[in-house]
Structure formats: structure tokens, C-alpha cells
């Protein structure tokens, strides 16, 4: 299957509703992906990083203070016809926000965090997914090793499990089959802390390690 075909039939979904409590002094009342670097919003760098892939659509899920998000960014995105922004009436977290994809009739999709850049080949990630799994997570090196729960990649069959002080961590880039949405209810929840742990335990998701450029704000 050609690389171009893979992404032409897949949506890119960006989680852009984070509050950014760790960097609040730099954000003010703005959503985390709206922080500026060199007079450019971070989410614009995220979009530029993924513009080389020919996605069917780009769907941005906006949560925290989404009005500011639209006021600041809407003019810059108006010429990008494939981009759709979805506002949340109430904050649903990184898990609950994905329920908005059901009304968009989303099938298989790539999911990325709006506060992360992980410059990997998404075609490679998608092609690596086993037919028996419903998703795959891109993993990167954990240089700080401070998180309590990090994803470690087993040596056999690319099976994921949790391990403290692991040298490998979740890179914030995923490819999911549409079946993942059946595991998410329309209520506030965390993808990282509630939904993924259950799916990992059921062995329905796998991991793939990449040694590419990674930054998380």
C-alpha cells in the first residue's frame, strides 16, 4: 500500500485544550498550545510539522478558553480548508474530548498533542500497526525519568506495560482505529491516565520506538 494512500484516508486530530499549569506565568489566560515562540503560536509549529502528510482532514479539539484560541488563530487558518476546529461546551479532558469525533464520522485517525512536536514518519507508525490491535503509540526516550507511570516497550511482540523510572515514554503521537471510540464515554476523562491503561492491560495496543526530534512544552 503506497504511503500517500495511507494518510489520504485518515484524519489528523490535535488535542488543543490544555491549560498549561506548569507554564501558566508565560501563558496568562491562553490555552497551552497558544504560547508564542519567535512571534508564532506553538500549534502553528505543530501544524507545519505535519503539513507534509496528506491527511484527509485536520481536526483540532479546542477545550480551555477556546474563544481566545479562535480569535487569535482563526484568521491564520482560514485558508487551510481541510482544518476543522471543534469547540467543547464543557471541559472533557484528553479522553472525553475524543467523543466529539463520533459526530464527525471519523474512522481511523492519527492523534497528536497540541503541546508536543515529535517529528516522526507517520506512515511508518501506521504501517507498523498489527491487524489484531486497535492502536499504536509512538515512544521516545525519557531523559528526565521523573514521571510515575511511563510506557516501556517489551522485547517480545512490541507489548506495552507500565514501569516506573523507565527510559522510554509516551511521545504523544498515536494512530487509532475507530474502535478506540467505543472505549470512551461522553464524560470528563484522561486519555493518558484512564483510557490507555485499560487498553494496554487488555493488550489491544502496541508501541513503536522512534529516536527523532521531540519537544514537549
Predicted ranges, named:
Residues 34, 83-85, 135, 205-207, ...:
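Conserved beta-strand scaffold positions in the cores of enzyme catalytic domains, especially
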Residues 11, 56-58, 82, 108, ...:
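Residues at the starts of beta-strands that form the adenosine-phosphate
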Residues 44, 95, 99, 192:
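Glycine-rich phosphate-binding loop at the start of an alpha helix
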Residues 2-69:
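N-terminal glycine-rich phosphate-binding loop and ensuing alpha1 helix
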Residues 109-110, 117, 123-130, 142-145, ...:
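Catalytic-core segments of class I nucleotidyltransferases/pyrophosphorylases
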Residues 67-150:
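Conserved beta-loop-beta/alpha segment of the NTase-like Rossmann-fold superfamily
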Amino acid at each position: 500500500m503506497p504511503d500517500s494512500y495511507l494518510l489520504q484516508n485518515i484524519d489528523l486530530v490535535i488535542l488543543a485544550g490544555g491549560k498549561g499549569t506548569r507554564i501558566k506565568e508565560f501563558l496568562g489566560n491562553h490555552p497551552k498550545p497558544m504560547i508564542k515562540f519567535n512571534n508564532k503560536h506553538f500549534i502553528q509549529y505543530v501544524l507545519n510539522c505535519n503539513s507534509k502528510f496528506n491527511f484527509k482532514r485536520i481536526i483540532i479539539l479546542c477545550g480551555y478558553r477556546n474563544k481566545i484560541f479562535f480569535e487569535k488563530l482563526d484568521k491564520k487558518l482560514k485558508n487551510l480548508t481541510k482544518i476543522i476546529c471543534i469547540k467543547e461546551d464543557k471541559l472533557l479532558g484528553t479522553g472525553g474530548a475524543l467523543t466529539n469525533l463520533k459526530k464527525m464520522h471519523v474512522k481511523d485517525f492519527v492523534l497528536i498533542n497540541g503541546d508536543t512536536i515529535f517529528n516522526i514518519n507517520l506512515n511508518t507508525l501506521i504501517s507498523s500497526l498489527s491487524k489484531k490491535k486497535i492502536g499504536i503509540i509512538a515512544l521516545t526516550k525519557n531523559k528526565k525519568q521523573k514521571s510515575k507511570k511511563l510506557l516501556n516497550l517489551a522485547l517480545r511482540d512490541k507489548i506495552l506495560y507500565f514501569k516506573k523510572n523507565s527510559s522510554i515514554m509516551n511521545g504523544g503521537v498515536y494512530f487509532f482505529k475507530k474502535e478506540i471510540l467505543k472505549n470512551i464515554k461522553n464524560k470528563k476523562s484522561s486519555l493518558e491516565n484512564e483510557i490507555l491503561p485499560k487498553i494496554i492491560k487488555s493488550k489491544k495496543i502496541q508501541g513503536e520506538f522512534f529516536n527523532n526530534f521531540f519537544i514537549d512544552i
